[in-house]
Amino acid sequence: MHKPKESRIIDRNQSVLPDITGAIGSTPLVELSRFGKNLNGRILAKLDYLNPGFSKKDRAALQIILDAESSGELVPGQTVIELTSGNMGTGLAIVCTIRGYPFIAVMSRGNSMERARMMRAMGAEVVLVDQCHDSVPGQVSGPDLQRVEDVTTRLVAERGGFRADQFLLEGNRRAHYMGTGPELVEQSSDSIDGFCDFVGSGGTLAGVTQFLKEHNPAIRCYAVEPDGAEALAGGRTDTPGHRIQGGGYLKPHLCALAGIKLDGYLRVSDSEAIQCARELAAKEGIFAGFSAGANVAAAMKLLRSEMAGKTIAVVIC
């Protein structure tokens, strides 16, 4: 076990930030004391929806762009292109606006149109891709995502763009290894026993798990998937049209998770995720989406079983 050598939490009250990207990360950690008062244990919620783009994806967006600049893969004036369910695109729109790159977000029509409007307001070009004929409107499936991938690949070739690929680029995982993980340890006074995360690209789960396991191998880390879309766990995959956006894409292998040792897989139903999201708002004043609800629902399952009496951390994104 090792301790972080110095604080990684930025005290933004001590200086004027040069631009909005300086406000990414160092988000608050809050105990869900009202929500979990009948639970045997604690749930600590990392409020990453307080990032400038309202999600944890701001961290990955910034790190991917910084890495690409450093390596020379991204040159001044080059167009940045990436597929998104909304959050990654918003983060990239912010970072590209500040650092001077045109940005194209490619998005399924099954995703939130509010996010598309937000990205356009920040200067992004948004390309919307129709869902498959047998898809449920508003519920993005694996085949829907493949359509978005195909359009993204074509646009990168046509525009000579830089693909800010959150599924492949190491910056996604590194953002959470260098930021979210150390912040969780420091803010919790090293009291975390477990961590669980709803998996989209896998970057958050991979980066946080890698840091926590290096810090203390006894900390248990879990992947969260939708009930019936359990590709990582090798379980059922007969419900691709679940309502938990941002993950559950039926991808059994994710680059970010290669070599990452997980302690288990948790499945959460639509109704469990939705109910937890509603209760977060009603009981804790935390207004978040269904993926955040899935994280909290999974943490509750752990506290009612193998991790009773422990402290579980989640990200509210």
Which residues does each predicted region cover?
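PLP-dependent amino-acid enzyme catalytic core
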Residues: 1-317
